[in-house]
């Protein structure tokens, strides 16, 4: 709760806060004992009832470093693929406000920056808000007005939904634990032509999705108002009001 003071003069306020997100409260429970594939056989795709893991068996698998298919052990090295893909999520809020109050009026200005780092790579939001307002009263004339500017921009908001671009489904539901997602951070074999991934028919490398299949936004919003009033008599006054709304 903020209360207006009665004292005249200059007032400067600085606030800063940082919050960290704990991640998902609940996630689907999935098995990590069998590889991708079906009917007891390893293969890439959207099924996860392939060969048994961690019992000494091998299968022809994709090597993300040599970009070749080689015979490798079937082990559950990707049990924590979703967790290992996620990043520390945080929200930082910084605000500076300055106000001046005098005998006939007051003026206030404020600048706020909010930075939200998402839990997936390349997910972040920047929001800047600047506002200025003032009021004045002198004899029979009074005036007040304000202007607020909002700017919001982010590089990508993909990855949270259902489908081929959904990280939760790609890493937890539709793929097995026989690969480590961290081995695929270098998601290009040939820049802008061929991605580094074991199966591009069903879905893409999650790091490729995060950095290349992007849906960004950058917008500016301006709101303003102006009000003036003149009292001719206790029962007669003239009022003028105007507003501004701009979006780009």
Predicted region positions:
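Outer-membrane beta-barrel transmembrane strands
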Residues: 87-103, 112-114, 128, 206-246
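Flexible glycine-/small-residue-rich
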Residues: 2, 16-18, 100
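A beta-strand signature from Gram-negative outer-membrane beta-barrel systems
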Residues: 1-13, 86, 91-93, 106, ...
